[in-house]
Amino acid sequence: IPIIPKFQERPGDFADLLLIGFDKTHLEDQNHLDRMVHFFLYDYRFERVWKNPDNDIEKLSRYRAVLSPDFSMYLEMAPVMQLYNVFRNRWCGAYWASKGLRVIPTVNWGDESTFDFCFEGIEKGSVVAVSTYMASEHDNRCDQKEWFMAGYNEMLRRIEPEKIICYNTPFPEMQGNIIHVDYERSSWRYMNYERSFHREDLDAFKIGGTSSNNRDTIEPYLIGKGGGSAYGADWKPNPKKPN
């Protein structure tokens, strides 16, 4: 797995830090260049950075820094897909760093079986980024704190990060030098953007006839967004119900 070099901190890098979603970045942006770019998004919104990693370098270089792409690590994923997504995360981050971008590795994990590879490619003492959003209770999703804290504590043990950027409210049990980034202040709601997506960007995620609104789908696509259970740790499909 490629190694993302340690982030070289500059004065003010983490002062009043806000993030901007990759899908809201553009070359003409003059108002949000002091933010770091995050990929805590549905995977289809940034799949292109894996397919064409050079295309967005000029744009990304204008921002304060870039978090490595957070390709999803759902518990329901096959292990080979989890490993593949860790590889893609680190490869993009390492490649961008080699091109002069300031990159902070995003860390995600599945269950304990992923711990042997999901922290690879990150040097000890690095600055890292995590998000509690998908592990927190909201909308139809249940709390997944137990899953999150198991991986978080293992990350502390293996990486010993210098700083941890936490997108969304940290859990009280989280230890370490945490830099809390407010989810709402960083969201598109405060940036006068409209939600949009291109249907052609979803081709890789098409799964056929899916009708449930209780998992991360846009009919008829299964789309990743982070980690934990794709079913929000609560609702699960009825195995007796015909597809």
Model region roles, listed by residue range:
Residues 11, 18, 99, 156, ...:
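Generic alpha-helical secondary structure signal
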Residues 1-9, 176-207, 214:
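C-terminal accessory extensions appended to soluble enzyme cores
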Residues 41-45, 169-170, 210-211, 226:
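Short, flexible beta-strand-to-coil junctions
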Residues 3-6, 12, 199, 221, ...:
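Generic low-complexity segments that are intrinsically disordered, proline-rich and/or Lys/Arg-biased
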Residues 207-243:
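Arg/Lys-rich, low-complexity, intrinsically disordered basic segments
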Residues 28, 37, 47-197:
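Eukaryote-skewed repeat-based solenoidal scaffolds used as protein-protein interaction platforms
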Residues 1-57, 77, 158, 193, ...:
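Non-catalytic, usually N-terminal nucleic-acid engagement modules in DNA/RNA processing proteins
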